[in-house]
Amino acid sequence: VNTLASSVRVLLALIVCSSLSGCYVMQAALGQLDVSARREPIAELLSSPSTPDPLRRRLEYVAEAREFATRELSLPDNGSYTTYADVGRPYVVWNVFATPEFSVEPRRWCFPIAGCVVYRGYFNERAATRYALRRRMRGDDATVGGVAAYSTLGHFEDPVLNTMLGWNDAQLAGTLFHELAHQLVYVAGDSEFNEAFATVVEEAGLERWLKFKGLEKDLESWRLQRRRNVEFIQLLLATRERLKALYASGASPAEMRARKHEEFGRLKFEYTQLKARWGGYAGYDAWFNRALGNAHLVSAATYHGCVPGIRAILEQEGGDLPRFYARMKALANESKEARRSRLCT
């Protein structure tokens, strides 16, 4: 692990930060430095007799999935996910999403390297909650969500985190594939394209991984959950489209506020119908058991709005991942508008 190089990058970020109001970059740089400092080589942990057996089994699984990602999925072969870090908390980062009261378009924030993104990430939950409160006081819809993993796009050697190990095997492997995909193709300022590409790689990779492992039961469970998730996302995107039309209708603020409330009530009702069709599956109950606003729809649009278009390109290439990656890299060189018109709903 090149700790010196990582520290130099962080120190440069701190210098940049000294001129920024609120020092948001400071907390991000210090948070990343803390994660980097906690890294331990997985190979050493696996050879150490003091490593607890449950952790050892999870890390053995990660090591095998990581090797598969390079060999079978043509994903980057580097130091990412060859180390482990315990950050001592349930999430590594908390993201704040915000929208104007009468808009489904997310607020965007621009940073070095990542470009403009639809969230602000905080390594401290209270800081994220405070920022979301400030956005609400300015009239925005805002929500905070915990994040168990993220990608530094290859600028650091991303570790496997303790926050990831509570997932089932399929989710853990899928996240590795997703985050490594960000290192392969990433367009600064186009979160929708980036996340949809990584999601398609995650899906394709996980299908192949579970078949490789001979886990037919896990594969069927994952396919069922994916179908449910598609229906859940379609529900959110349909609500988003109705709200988008409402906000463009020219109605008075009072009328829009009332109809907005009705739309989120309709969303919750439609979820109860969907849940009944699922035979009572309650996996999304926690998502709905809160007051909802525009900001809660941001992730659905960001992560899934372009997925069908990108998935179609993978199918056009017969599932050949290197050819698919080449198509994606070519699209990455086009304008954002051209990509969106071709790929996104």
Predicted features by range, described:
Residues 17-20:
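Bacterial Sec-type N-terminal signal peptides, specifically the leucine/valine-rich hydrophobic h-region
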Residues 1-11:
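Bacterial N-terminal signal peptides that target proteins for export
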Residues 28-55:
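Post-signal peptide N-terminal segment of mature Sec-exported envelope proteins
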Residues 233-345:
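Pan-zinc metallopeptidase signature
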